[in-house]
Amino acid sequence: MSNETNCTLDFEQSVELFKEYNLFITAFLLFLTIILQYGYATRSKFIYILKMIVLWCFWPLNIAVGVISCIYPPNTGGLVAAIILTVFACLSFVGYWIQSIRLFKRCRSWWSFNPESNAVGSILLTNGQQCNFAIESVPMVLSPIIKNGVLYCEGQWLAKCEPDHLPKDIFVCTPDRRNIYRMVQKYIGDQSGNKKRFATFVYAKQSVDTGELESVATGGSSLYT
């Protein structure tokens, strides 16, 4: 007689288990839905940060589940598949950290560890403020605006400033490149003639190099002074 215990659940046990934990499952799925649907930097920074934390947790969770699958494979084919998937998850996770650290060394912004993209925009205002923002890709044109004394770029709130605080050049950094954008057009004022209420600027991609933001100087001052 075998002493092994059958740990599989039949249909009735599965139904009872679901009934017991359905409230937790509902709350968890609702949490994920809200995070994934409303987690954008242009909507709510708080929810967006929660979304980033959830995405960060997925990779270690995938690796842990993959290791468990390797330890307790259903059969030989399942073991091979589990090993392949676990190795892929580990390589992807390591690759993410390598690229994020390279980007952080280039722009010194915590947005470098954003799992949704590998690019960070940087604006050094002439008053000494440094504004970094998440950006999904490297565009050909950037159009920051100032509305009621607040600077926005890519729909994200950055800082309070005046129109004359915008620099001649702004940057978008990737792990291996620094993209330089030069101001080609600006409009300051509105129909009421109040120049402090609204201003829009157009920056076109000017050049690409491999420098870091630390090498940029504006008016003789380092970016980080």
Swiss-Prot record:
Oligomeric form and interacting partners: Homomultimer. Interacts with envelope E protein in the budding compartment of the host cell, which is located between endoplasmic reticulum and the Golgi complex. Forms a complex with HE and S proteins. Interacts with nucleocapsid N protein. This interaction probably participates in RNA packaging into the virus.
Note the CDD domains from the entry.
Answer: gammaCoV_M
Q: Which GO terms describe its molecular function?
A: structural constituent of virion
Question: Which loops or segments lie on the Intravirion side of the membrane, by the record?
Answer: 42-51, 99-225
What does the similarity note say?
Belongs to the gammacoronaviruses M protein family.
Q: Give the organism's phylogenetic lineage.
A: Viruses, Riboviria, Orthornavirae, Pisuviricota, Pisoniviricetes
Q: Which organism is it from?
A: Avian infectious bronchitis virus (strain D1466)
For this entry, the protein name equals Membrane protein
Virion surface domain ranges by topology = 1-20, 73-77
Function as written in the Swiss-Prot or TrEMBL entry:
Component of the viral envelope that plays a central role in virus morphogenesis and assembly via its interactions with other viral proteins.
Q: Which Pfam families match?
A: CoV_M
Protein localization: Virion membrane; Host Golgi apparatus membrane
> Source organism's superkingdom?
Viruses
- Indicate the transmembrane segments per the record: 21-41, 52-72, 78-98
**Chief localization:** virion
- Name a GO CC annotation attached to this entry: viral envelope
The UniProt keyword set, sorted, is: Glycoprotein, Host Golgi apparatus, Host membrane, Membrane, Transmembrane, Transmembrane helix, Viral envelope protein, Viral matrix protein, Virion
Gene this chain is encoded by: M
Topology with regard to the membrane? Multi-pass membrane protein
